[in-house]
């Protein structure tokens, strides 16, 4: 893969939609998002990122370094588990971190090298902790 980008880049996407809905609001029955003052349609950054992800996925078709991490209907832990397996890391990350303190950097580098959208937009990565948090009203009464 080529040298990573060292600078930050901002971009603007201008497009025109006539008789369409480029970014429906799921909380409002998929109605178009509209600026109440101007009457112009609004498109969120999330929508633009999805359009870019879809374009790159279509153009590159899983080419090395251009895979997409955030896919509709695909759990993120599949890609996380693949990274752990490929790097030969113990799935028990607490034990793995004791053995190798640089494990976070290795995981970050792997994910950035393989996933276009992580490199481009960044990502909040999991801590790979399995399990659930249980909150009960009894716990609130104790405080």
Task: List the predicted regions and their residue ranges.
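A generic local secondary-structure boundary/capping motif
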Residues: 1-3, 130-131
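An N-terminal structural lobe/cap that precedes and organizes the functional/catalytic core
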Residues: 2-83
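A generic, well-ordered mixed alpha/beta core segment in the N-terminal half of proteins
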Residues: 80-129
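Conserved small/polar residues in nucleotide/adenosyl-binding loops
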Residues: 135-138
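Phosphate-rich cofactor/ligand-interacting catalytic cores and adjacent structured alpha/beta frameworks
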Residues: 143
């Amino acid at each position: 893969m080529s040298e990573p980008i060292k600078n930050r880049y901002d971009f603007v996407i201008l497009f025109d939609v006539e008789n369409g809905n480029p970014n429906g609001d799921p909380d409002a029955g998929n109605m178009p998002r509209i600026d109440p003052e101007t009457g112009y349609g609004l498109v969120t950054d999330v929508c633009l990122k999805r359009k870019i992800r879809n374009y790159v996925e279509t153009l590159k078709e899983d080419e090395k370094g251009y895979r997409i991490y955030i896919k509709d209907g695909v759990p993120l832990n599949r890609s996380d588990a693949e990274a752990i397996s490929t790097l030969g890391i113990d799935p028990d990350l607490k034990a793995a971190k004791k053995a190798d303190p640089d494990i976070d950097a290795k995981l970050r580098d792997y994910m950035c090298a393989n996933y276009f959208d992580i490199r481009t937009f960044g990502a909040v990565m999991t801590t790979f902790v399995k399990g659930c948090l249980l909150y009960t009203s009894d716990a609130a009464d104790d405080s």
